[in-house]
Amino acid sequence: GANLPDQDRVFNNYGKFFMEMSRRSKEGIPTISVVFGNATAGGAYVPGMSDYSILQKNAAKVFLAGPPLVKMATNEDANDEELGGAQMHSSISGVSDFLAKDEKDALEITKNLIKKIKQPADNKYKSDASSPKFVKDEIIGIIPSNLKKRFDIRELVKRFVDSSEFIEFKENYGRTMFCCWTKINGYPIGIIANNGVIFIESARKATHFIQLANKSNTPLLFIHNTTGFM
């Protein structure tokens, strides 16, 4: 790459790229980043600034500097997976919204996202309703009599949404908050439901999801079973 003192001339228009991403996001034009390999230095900002980020497991790496530079600067030993691997960004930093198993899975996730983006819940976008695959009466057996006891909110959602299908957002990050896109009676909606004690990461996840729902004009359903805050 270019010498550091010369980067103001080599990458003099790079900031404009980030500005355009922010501007388009504000105008409701989303950006989807799909990372199959290394996104380093300036490229590391792109997934973080995108509305939706998909990282491939055991392949995607997102960091400003790799292990050699970290070793030189701090004398610390770290591998690339710890610094910016897909698993780390999906469970710890929250940069990744979706963790794909492989390239095919990443592209499938991308296709599903494109289908649901910019679909306001009016008659124009209403699809045929379909019944849940699970029996609704089972809801009574899922919710415990002790309201302070945690239960898997996904099992509840599966019993009232169309076809019992949903697209979960940041599945491995802030796991005590469940966020998903789905349909009820043919109408697209988003669901936010806490899945236990609400931690900081859980709150950040919900905030990000609400912002995305506002941009796509998607109504939200909130399901509460808060057992505590941390």
Predicted regions and their residues:
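Conserved catalytic cores of soluble enzyme domains
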Residues: 1-122, 226-230
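Gly-rich Lys/Arg/Thr-decorated short loops/hinges at beta-loop-alpha junctions or inter-strand turns
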Residues: 1-5, 71, 134-141, 152, ...
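Generic, ordered loop/turn and secondary-structure boundary motif
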Residues: 5, 18, 63-65, 70-74, ...
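Short low-complexity stretches enriched in small and charged residues
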Residues: 8-12, 49, 54-56, 142-151, ...
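Short, exposed beta-strand "edge-strand" segments with a Pro/Gly-rich flavor and a Y/T-containing core
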Residues: 72-77, 94-101, 142-151, 194-198
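Terminal amphipathic helices with adjacent charged low-complexity linkers/tails
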Residues: 98-157
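Non-catalytic terminal/interface segments that mediate subunit docking, oligomerization
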Residues: 149-230
